[in-house]
């Protein structure tokens, strides 16, 4: 296993692709790059340009809450109660913790302080009273994978024929479909026509 091992080189030719990780050369038929925000520097190792937007976001979590917060839906998006405030989104994990964020995927947020976490929890509790009394736990700023034009990147690149790229926001919703399409193209050699507008070479 090569988990959490830095990749220092990627090459591809007509017959194989090679990755250098931890000083070891790994050769395979195809390499799939699905590294989120790190896809840009990884692809650059193979001479492929995949520019991304800077898209920071902040969420908070709570301590475990024993009672279910949402009975009929898995996620709530709630409009702001005050002018100038972003909307709130909320979901509860199986362990009872709540994840709370604000704004849309276009929103840029970098405030991961405790005061901001407390304020965000208080706003969420206005919609879901069961959150009152919970503790807000800040989560460090996260960076969303976001191709420069906002659309997914999926497919082989002419510059590296055995390197398959997959990059998108939101991967949570699109990953199952993208995985199925990628499998068809990698394993079966199919060309999925509706992916034509999302190929990596559009940035070249």
Residue ranges and their predicted role:
Residues 125-204:
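C-terminal catalytic lobe of FAD-dependent flavoproteins
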Residues 35-159:
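Active-site substrate-recognition segment that forms the wall
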Residues 20-22:
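Short strand-coil-strand connectors
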Residues 2-3, 33, 165:
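General beta-strand structural signal in soluble alpha/beta enzymes
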Residues 15-18, 72, 162:
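Short, hydrophobic/aromatic-rich segments at coil-to-beta transitions
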Residues 3-16:
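A conserved short coil-to-beta-strand element within the FAD-binding core of flavoproteins
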Residues 26-38, 179:
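Short hydrophobic core segments
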């Amino acid at each position: 296993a090569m988990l959490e091992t830095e990749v220092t080189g990627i090459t591809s030719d007509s017959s194989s692709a090679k990755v250098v990780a931890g000083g070891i050369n790994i050769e395979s038929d195809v390499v799939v790059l699905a590294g989120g925000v790190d896809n840009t520097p990884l692809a650059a190792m193979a001479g492929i340009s995949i520019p991304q937007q800077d898209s920071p976001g902040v969420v908070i979590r709570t301590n475990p809450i024993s009672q279910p917060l949402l009975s009929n839906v898995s996620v709530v998006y709630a409009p702001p109660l005050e002018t100038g405030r972003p909307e709130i989104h909320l979901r509860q994990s199986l362990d009872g913790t709540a994840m709370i964020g604000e704004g849309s995927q276009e929103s840029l947020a970098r405030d991961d302080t405790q005061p901001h976490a407390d304020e965000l929890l208080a706003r969420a509790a206005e919609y879901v009273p069961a959150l009152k009394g919970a503790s807000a736990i800040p989560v460090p700023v996260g960076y969303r994978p976001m191709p420069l034009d906002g659309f997914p990147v999926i497919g082989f690149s002419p510059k590296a024929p055995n390197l398959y790229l997959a990059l998108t926001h939101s991967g949570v919703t699109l990953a199952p479909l993208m995985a199925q399409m990628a499998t068809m193209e990698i394993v079966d050699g199919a060309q999925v026509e509706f992916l034509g507008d999302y190929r990596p070479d559009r940035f070249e």
